[in-house]
A protein has these predicted regions:
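ATP-binding N-terminal substructure of ATP-dependent carboxylate-amine bond-forming enzymes
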Residues: 1-74
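Short glycine-/acidic-enriched loop or helix-start segments at secondary-structure transitions
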Residues: 3-4, 60-63, 126-128, 158, ...
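Structural motif
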Residues: 48-49, 174, 230
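Active-site nucleotide/adenylate-binding loops and adjacent lid/helix of ATP-dependent enzymes
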Residues: 78-154, 164-168, 194-201, 328
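A short beta-strand motif that forms the metal-chelation/ATP-contact edge
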Residues: 116-118, 162, 227-237
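ATP-dependent carboxylate/phosphate-activation module, predominantly the ATP-grasp catalytic core
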Residues: 150-211, 235-258
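A short glycine-rich, hydrophobically flanked beta-strand micro-motif that places a catalytic Asp/Glu
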Residues: 213-225
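Peripheral (often C-terminal) accessory segments that flank ATP-dependent C-N-forming ligase machineries
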Residues: 258-332
């Protein structure tokens, strides 16, 4: 929806159609003239531009077409190596970039718990979280489809979004993700601008080695024990917080769609829909961040946003406070 919003705001005469893959929920929105189910290649023929957004659709496009273009940027099938978490961790380790200790089965784990588990091959969504005991690990569904990693303490995830051509990064933007949904690691809720030369150097080293062409987000955690950033993964797709990058760096939309606009200097933002999804206990805890954010990002009109508060149990006084804050800050 971030791309659609910017196309309609700054583009000239774009007609947008949404799409979803079989098995995915259909998302209707006023941004789209129509929404269709993409069952085969014929569903996307005849369009000037087809831009997959999630992991499932990006993988499908790369497998069906091998390479596809969005304006002057090619996305190559070879990028799917980044979806294979054990392989990309091994490659990055060989480049001299710090990585977490990673295990492909529970029996191989030889480090103190907790460990972080996630999909072995990126499929979008899926189980992820912390396990503090082997009994907890054994209760996980589809254990053979997961990897288990050394837990790097700390809530902050550092990201560098980029567009690259043949291994050269042509534009990028760094951020720090201070709050995620789910809490243990997921999509950004509270995010701030950030810059560190080591993150730039590590990401450039990885992208060069991959000869990466396309777009993605490299993610890191900071390890106090190592006194260094630890590579976590590359999301070789559009990332959940990309609108924050659009706000601060107009080169992303210029390269992808030939659209130019003046970027703003937005220091921080909260994604309201995900903030609400955290539940009221976490919302109470992070009210200061809500009040201090430079920008609120949400993808529904204000009426439906406020109605969403009634779907979760929130103390009346807190609900009234949050509603007032959102209404007062509308349009920022």
């Amino acid at each position: 929806l971030a791309v659609a919003r910017y196309l309609l705001k700054y583009g000239n005469g774009y007609v947008l159609h949404g799409g979803f893959m079989p098995g995915e929920a259909m998302t209707k929105h006023s941004y789209y003239e129509k929404v269709l189910c993409v069952k085969d290649k014929s569903a996307v023929s005849g369009y000037d531009i087809v831009l997959p957004t999630g992991a499932k659709s990006t993988r499908w496009m790369a497998e069906q077409f091998g390479e596809f273009r969005v304006n002057d940027i090619s996305y190559c099938k070879e990028n799917l190596l980044c979806f294979d978490k054990p392989r990309i961790i091994s490659l990055v380790k060989d480049l001299g970039v710090p990585v977490p200790k990673t295990f492909e089965n529970i029996g191989a784990i030889d480090i103190p718990l907790p460990v972080f588990y996630k999909q072995k091959f990126e499929e979008g969504g899926g189980p992820r979280g912390l396990a503090s005991s082997f009994a907890q690990l054994e209760q996980l569904q589809s254990k053979e489809r997961l990897i288990y990693q050394e837990y790097i303490p700390g809530a902050i995830t550092y990201g560098m979004g980029f567009i690259a051509k043949s291994g050269d990064i042509i534009t990028s933007f760094q951020h720090e993700e201070l709050l995620s949904y789910p809490i243990q690691g997921g999509s950004a809720v509270y995010i701030r601008t950030f810059w560190d030369e080591r993150i730039r150097e590590y990401t450039e080293r990885i992208i060069k080695a991959l000869q990466f062409s396309g777009w993605g987000l490299a993610e890191y955690k900071y390890c106090l024990k190592r006194q260094d950033y630890v590579f976590m993964e590359i999301n070789a797709k559009l990332w959940a917080s990309i609108e924050f990058a659009f706000m601060n760096n107009s080169d992303f939309m210029r390269h992808l769609f030939g659209i130019d606009y003046i970027a703003n200097n937005v220091k921080s933002a909260i994604f309201i829909n995900r903030f609400i999804a955290l539940g009221w206990r976490q919302m109470v805890r992070y009210v200061p961040q809500l009040l201090n954010a430079s920008k609120y990002i949400y993808y529904h009109n204000s009426g439906s946003l406020i109605r969403s508060f009634t779907s979760i149990t929130i103390p009346h006084k807190l609900k009234r406070l949050l509603k007032n804050v959102l209404l007062q800050r509308r349009g920022l």
